[in-house]
UniProtKB/Swiss-Prot annotation:
It is an enzyme of class 3 (hydrolase). This is Subtilisin-like serine protease Pen ch 18.0101. The lineage of its organism: Eukaryota, Fungi, Dikarya, Ascomycota, Pezizomycotina. Glycans are attached at residues 244, 280, 443. Residues 17-136, 454-494 form a propeptide. Residues 1-16 form the signal peptide. Keywords: Allergen, Glycoprotein, Hydrolase, IgE-binding protein, Protease, Serine protease, Signal, Zymogen. SUPFAM superfamilies: Protease propeptides/inhibitors, Subtilisin-like. It comes from the Eukaryota. Gene3D superfamilies: Peptidase S8 propeptide/proteinase inhibitor I9, Peptidase S8/S53 domain. Residues 43-136 form the Inhibitor I9 domain. One of its GO terms (molecular function) is IgE binding. PROSITE patterns: SUBTILASE, SUBTILASE_HIS, SUBTILASE_SER. CDD domains: Peptidases_S8_PCSK9_ProteinaseK_like. It comes from Penicillium rubens.
Length: 494
């Protein structure tokens, strides 16, 4: 979606980046507006300067409430005195943010006169127009096995013999919490085996349930018994999108804050069975400096973060949270080892994972499944893989215990062991890397020591690979048919 709103009396300065900046005074905080998503009228995210501490932020917010209340009162008086005059009621303060001691700010619904006063406050760094975010899935249905799991556990392209064979360490995901920041999750689904929990509902007035299915699907790919990469991880649903699959940038930032705080609280408990936290965000909108900073702050707090690259077949750097430098930005690949036709690309894309026709958990019943596509489906493969690798570290009460692997270290490790050069239709400025789980090994140190792998079939075409799969299927079919014929022949002979 294209579009942006600017204040009608302000000149618009458009930089080379996909963010428009509005400003009329050199000493006033700029108003940022994405040019690749739809702004929400009169809704803003305000970010403080680095020197502002929580106490000063609280004082500022008290001042803001006074300004907002006074303005509302003036508008009420004007409404009574002028026949036919009407004005929209503004909600005022909606969220406050303080993420891992790094990002400090708030969001709300304000009249432009109030925003002008906020802009001139010396504590304000910038203001961002709140905007729409949406899930990153593409609709399609196909009832087949989760080939994506098989693909990340094999180096070479899949054949009929290993098409649905997932090689993995049974303890994968144990002791790891996965925060799925999405539409919620069907926590009673049997595939979660009781490991799924409702974390937090951010949109005001929304129910504690997944009325969409998208978040449940992502959760299943991360940690489901049948459909998951890390089959023993715990899932925490953080609902930031409504049942229609869309929401606001400010709600998403608040969801990131909740996950970061939950992780920090869990880390401080000293539970020796707890190994770490991962997060997945299979959603996105236009470029948002605030959301990117929020994700980076959560990573600094210790969360291993995977985000979808986006489904616009465009440069991922123009979208958030895909542009968050400390997260792992994931593009989508197909069964034929090509970049999915919708997948974003570019230098902000770190790695690829299966994202076309992915089968996973769904809503409607505790056994429901669905097959959908998108970078939304690729990202949870990586979130699950992060949980998988984190869990392979020795337990904290073990004689072999080591220091926790940091998000920066694990991101580098994930990239270093990936399968290189196997994908087609990859632009020159995009890493040609496909995720790998170690081929079933439970030895994290050995997986790292073995390092990456350059695919032997890097130069084959998509048509060649499809042909290989079909040939393998035909050979397997004839082999099976021959075995059945032999059994019948032996039975007749007897």
């Amino acid at each position: 979606m294209k579009g942006f709103l600017s204040l009608t009396l302000l000149p618009l300065l458009v930089a080379a980046s996909p963010v428009a900046v509005n400003s009329i005074h050199n000493d006033a905080a700029p108003i940022l507006s994405s040019m690749t998503s739809k702004d929400i009228p009169d809704s803003y995210i305000v970010v403080f300067k680095k020197h502002v501490d929580p106490s000063s932020a609280s004082a500022h917010q008290s001042w803001l409430q006074e300004v907002h209340t006074a303005h509302t009162g003036r508008m009420e008086l004007k409404k009574r005195s002028l026949f036919g005059f009407d004005f929209e009621a503004f909600m005022g303060l909606k969220h406050t943010f303080h993420i891992a001691g790094s990002l400090l700010g708030y969001a709300g619904h304000f009249h432009e006169d109030v925003i002008e006063q906020i802009r001139r406050h010396p504590d304000v760094d910038y203001i961002e127009k709140d905007s729409e975010v949406r899930t990153m899935s593409e609709g399609s249905v196909e009832k087949n096995a989760p080939w994506g799991l098989a693909r990340i556990s094999h180096r070479e392209s899949l054949s009929f013999g290993n098409f649905n064979k997932y090689l993995y360490a049974e303890e994968g995901g144990e002791g790891v919490d996965a925060y799925v920041i999405d539409t919620g999750a069907n926590v009673k689904h049997v595939d979660f085996e009781g490991r799924a929990n409702w974390g937090k509902t951010i949109p005001q007035g929304d129910a504690d349930e997944d009325g969409n299915g998208h978040g449940t699907h992502c959760s299943g790919t991360i940690a489901g018994k049948k459909f998951g990469v890390a089959k023993k991880a715990n899932v925490y649903a953080v609902k930031v999108l409504r049942s229609n699959g869309s929401g606001t940038m400010s709600d998403v930032v608040k969801g990131v804050e909740w996950a970061a705080e939950a992780h920090i609280k869990k880390s401080k408990k000293g539970d020796k069975k707890f190994k770490g936290s991962v997060a997945n965000m299979s959603l996105g909108g236009g470029s948002s400096r605030t959301l990117d900073l929020a994700v980076n702050a959560a990573v600094d707090a210790g969360i291993h973060f995977a985000v979808a690259a986006g489904n616009d077949n465009a440069d991922a750097c123009n979208y958030s949270p895909a542009a968050a430098e400390k997260a792992i930005t994931v593009g989508a690949s197909t069964l034929a080892d090509e970049r999915a036709y919708f997948s974003n690309y570019g230098k902000c894309t770190d790695i690829f994972a299966p994202g076309l026709n992915i089968l996973s958990t769904w809503v409607g019943s505790d056994h429901a499944t669905n097959t959908i596509s998108g970078t939304s489906m690729a990202s949870p493969h990586i979130a699950g893989l992060l949980a998988y690798y984190v869990s392979l570290a020795p337990a904290k009460d073990s004689a072999y215990a080591v220091a926790d692997v940091t998000p920066k270290q694990l991101k580098a490790a994930l990239i270093s062991v990936a399968t290189e050069g196997t994908l087609t239709d990859i632009p020159s400025d995009t890493p040609n890397l496909l995720a790998w789980n170690g081929g079933g090994s439970a030895n994290y140190t050995k997986i790292l020591a073995d390092g990456g792998y350059k695919a032997h079939n890097a130069e084959t075409t998509v048509e060649d690979r499809i042909g290989i799969i079909i040939d393998s299927a035909e050979k397997a079919f004839h082999k099976e048919l021959g075995a059945i014929y032999s059994e019948i022949k032996d039975a007749v002979s007897v």
